[in-house]
């Protein structure tokens, strides 16, 4: 097949697809911008790097959003050409050429501006009726009806221009927007509110008197005034009227800004639902509707003021630090086991709580008495099999008692078993006496350990060695 240029590919794509006139204009505009930069060249001759150079040039004169429109439409043309073998390319040269546009809030029209524009149009209507002369915007009654239709419905400009006489049902108070005229290709209905009803009645009655048929364009200024000679009303005539409103109010006004405005106002009202706005504007998904929502700064300011009036209450008291417990869950009984016998202790009942306290007092004497009992308790084997080869320094009797007190006071239960403290008791007694108790393995010699010091063998098999400045080896 003969190599084709991009304009030829674009024309081929338009012929093989059912596109709206406005969509065709966008494809041709993007192709024209391409030709202005590259000239008359084959579509297969431009590479991805060439497209990036073109993007850099275009972004110097147009917005990022406009460039993305060019990129997406021409990328579609290249994809179509590659799929049908119209161009010999393996990779779409416009792939990954989209840029991230700056996110700006939707442009809306203030209520005071709308009131001024409406009052001016009403004044022009009265002026034409009283003088019989053409006003600056003529016929004023027709343009007031167009103004109110955009204000109350938020209809798209193309959808309004494509409305037929038969699409307006005054009996059911509904406007039917045909799918072939909509951006989303979906047909939907728009209810006629009370404020718009008188204006549509005037338009429909006048159209009936003029002799409109069911398929005629209902909003057609050319048939309501002899001053215009065109067959159909187009977007240029509507935009010309809004330019005059812009000059009068000093604020830019367009049909699409009315669409932004109605979406924002509906979503500021709590009784409105986002799905109502979505259906009214005929959006394909809820995310598109959310983009039209403007933040309510007055409500934000009110909430911020309320927060400032409610000062935080600061508690300057020290909060106790409660360590986290990894024990049983709250409410579950914790089993109590004897450290000597290993049997589970029975919890005390409520009836015997007082008796239990008395028994605890009798069976658990004060700490001082417990230390006296330790001094007479029998010794147990501290070292079971391994000989002692550590060095420690003697401590005084008071220090030994203080260390024992700290160990006893940390006991979590009142039934702290004295049998577990026999090791500590022996350590206290021997340190207080200035002696060290060791157990000697069978293969060791006591002389090696004591180094000539007098040692006494106790009945339980331990050797008592006096403290000295020397080290125990």
Swiss-Prot record:
InterPro entries reported in the protein's UniProt record: CB, DNA_brk_join_enz, Integrase-like_cat_sf, Integrase_catalytic, Integrase_recombinase_N, Tyrosine_recombinase_XerCD
Listed GO CC annotations: cytoplasm
Domain of life: Bacteria
Keyword Cell membrane applies: no
Subcellular location: Cytoplasm
Chief place of localization: cytoplasm
A Pfam entry, by short name: Phage_integrase
Residue numbers spanned by region Disordered: 341-365
Polar residues bias: start-end ranges: 341-352
Disulfide linkage: none
Domain Core-binding (CB): 4-82
Keywords from the UniProt entry: Cell cycle, Cell division, Chromosome partition, Cytoplasm, DNA integration, DNA recombination, DNA-binding
Active-site residue numbers: 156, 183, 256, 259, 283, 292
Family under the similarity heading: Belongs to the 'phage' integrase family.
Note: In contrast to other XerC proteins, it has a much longer C-terminal part.
Free-text function comment from the UniProt entry: Site-specific tyrosine recombinase, which acts by catalyzing the cutting and rejoining of the recombining DNA molecules.
PANTHER family: PHAGE INTEGRASE-RELATED, PROPHAGE INTEGRASE INTD-RELATED
The protein's name in its UniProt record: Putative tyrosine recombinase XerC
Lineage, highest ranks first: Bacteria, Pseudomonadati, Pseudomonadota, Gammaproteobacteria, Pseudomonadales
